[in-house]
A protein has these predicted regions:
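Short, well-ordered amphipathic alpha-helices
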Residues: 99-108, 163-167, 198-199
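Gly/Thr-rich phosphate-binding beta-strand-loop-beta motif of the actin/hexokinase/Hsp70
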Residues: 2-28, 167-207
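Hydrophobic, small-residue-rich alpha-helical packing segments that form membrane-like cores
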Residues: 137-181, 189-190
C-alpha cells in the first residue's frame, strides 16, 4: 500500500505544506528525514496573508505586492477564537479562502510528488484552542479539498517532526539516547502563540 501524508502547518505569519510518501508504512524513499514541500514562488513557505482589491483576493506572496485600493488581512488565524462574532466570522471566511489557495497549489504540484493509492492530511493547531475551533480547522481543510483530514496540537506535531528529522543531531547532543526512553520538553514559539508539550520519546515507538 502506498500512501501520502500531507502535513499543513498553518501559522499566524507563515504557512508550510509538507509532503511525505510511504510504502507499507515506511518512507518510500527509504529516508525518514527527507521531506518535500508544496512550493509558492519557489519557496517552501508562504506568508499567511490575504489581500483584497475590489472583489478579487490575492494570497501569500501575491498579497505582498502593493495594489491600489487594497485591503490587507493578516493574523486572521488569531481571530478564529475572537469574542466578537463578526470578527470571528470574517476570520473563518478568510481561513477557508486561504486553505483553498493552499489546496490549489497542492493540486497543481502533486504530479511531482509521485502516484500513491491513498492520501491523508494532518493539520496542526494551538494546544489551547477549543474543541469547536479545532473541528472548524479540520472541516475547513476538508472543504478546501484536502483528503482524510485529521488534527493534532502544534507542540505535539512539532515534536513528531523534530524526532524524525533531527533525531541524529539530538542523539549527538545527548537529548535522546538510543534504546532508552527520553522526556523532551518541546517549546513551539510562533508569531501568535507559544505552546509547550512534554513528550516521552523512544526510538521506534510513538511519542
Amino acid at each position: 500500500m502506498t500512501e501520502r501524508l500531507i502535513g499543513i502547518d498553518f501559522g499566524t505569519s507563515t504557512t508550510v505544506v509538507h509532503i511525505k510518501n510511504y510504502t507499507d508504512g515506511r518512507p518510500s524513499d527509504g529516508d525518514g528525514t527527507s521531506i518535500q514541500y508544496v512550493e509558492f514562488d519557489g519557496q517552501g513557505v508562504v506568508p499567511s496573508l490575504i489581500q483584497k482589491v475590489e472583489d478579487t483576493y490575492y494570497f501569500g506572496y501575491d498579497a505582498k505586492q502593493p495594489k491600489k485600493d487594497e485591503k490587507i488581512y493578516r493574523n486572521f488565524k488569531m481571530k478564529l477564537e475572537s469574542s466578537d462574532e463578526k470578527e470571528q466570522a470574517e476570520a473563518e471566511k478568510l481561513t477557508l479562502l486561504f486553505f483553498r489557495f493552499l489546496y490549489e497549489a497542492y493540486e497543481e504540484q502533486k504530479v511531482h510528488f509521485g502516484t500513491v493509492q491513498m492520501e491523508k492530511t494532518l493539520i496542526s493547531y494551538p494546544a489551547k484552542w477549543t474543541e469547536r475551533t479545532r473541528r472548524f480547522m479540520v472541516s475547513c481543510a476538508e472543504q478546501a479539498g484536502f483528503p482524510d483530514v485529521r488534527g493534532m496540537d502544534e507542540p505535539t506535531a512539532a515534536m513528531y517532526s523534530v524526532s524524525v528529522q533531527e533525531r541524529e543531531r539530538m542523539e549527538a547532543l545527548g537529548a535522546l539516547e538510543k534504546g532508552r526512553s527520553s522526556y523532551v520538553l518541546m517549546i513551539d514559539m510562533g508569531a501568535g502563540t507559544t505552546d509547550l508539550a512534554l513528550c516521552r520519546y523512544k526510538a521506534g515507538a510513538q511519542a
